C-alpha cells in the first residue's frame, strides 16, 4: 500500500461516521449504478437514512448497497474516506428496538419532503483510509 495511505480501523470509521451527517448512498437501478447524497443517522453500527418511494428506495432495498463519506483539505493534501457496504433494508415498519429508535429520531431530510421511508444498512462492513501528506 502507498505510504501516504493509512487504513482506518472499524472504530475510527464509526467515529468519523458519528461526527458527520451527510454521505452518499450507491445503489443499482435498471442495471445502472446510481449515487445519491443523503443525510443520515448512525445508531451503533447501523447507518440509516430517510427517503421517498422511487428509484432510491427501490434500489436501496433490492440488495447490496454502498455508503460513503469523506473529507479532504486541498491545501494540505490530506483527507479521509469511509466506505460502508451491506444490505439495504426498509426498516420503516420494523418492530425491533434499534429500528424503532432510528425511525423515531429527529433526522430532518435536507432535501425536504415527507421522506416517510427509512432504509438501514444491514450486515455492514466498514473500511476506510486516511491520506497523510508526508513532505519530501
Predicted region positions:
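A structural signal for short, well-ordered beta-strand segments
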Residues: 40, 86-88, 123-125
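Short, structured beta-strand-loop surface elements
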Residues: 53-117
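Short hydrophobic/aromatic-rich beta-strand segments that constitute the beta-sheet cores
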Residues: 49-51, 67, 128
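Short, active-site-adjacent segments that bind or coordinate small-molecule cofactors and metal centers
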Residues: 104-136
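Extreme N-terminal tail/first-helix region
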Residues: 1-18
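Beta-strand-connecting loop/turn residues
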Residues: 45-46, 63, 124
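Short, surface-exposed beta-strand-loop junctions and turns on beta-sheet-rich folds
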Residues: 31, 55-57, 135
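Short beta-strand segments
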Residues: 20-52
Amino acid at each position: 500500500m502507498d505510504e501516504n495511505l493509512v487504513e482506518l480501523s472499524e472504530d475510527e470509521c464509526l467515529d468519523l461516521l458519528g461526527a458527520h451527517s451527510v454521505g452518499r448512498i450507491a445503489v443499482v437501478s435498471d442495471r445502472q449504478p446510481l449515487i445519491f447524497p443523503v443525510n443520515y443517522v448512525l445508531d451503533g453500527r447501523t447507518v440509516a437514512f430517510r427517503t421517498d418511494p422511487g428509484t432510491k428506495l427501490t434500489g436501496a432495498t433490492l440488495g447490496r448497497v454502498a455508503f460513503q463519506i469523506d473529507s479532504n483539505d486541498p491545501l494540505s493534501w490530506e483527507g479521509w474516506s469511509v466506505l460502508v457496504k451491506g444490505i439495504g433494508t426498509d426498516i420503516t415498519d420494523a418492530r425491533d428496538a434499534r429500528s424503532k429508535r432510528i425511525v423515531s429520531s429527529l433526522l430532518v431530510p435536507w432535501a425536504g419532503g415527507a421522506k416517510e421511508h427509512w432504509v438501514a444498512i444491514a450486515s455492514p462492513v466498514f473500511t476506510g483510509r486516511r491520506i497523510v501528506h508526508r513532505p519530501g
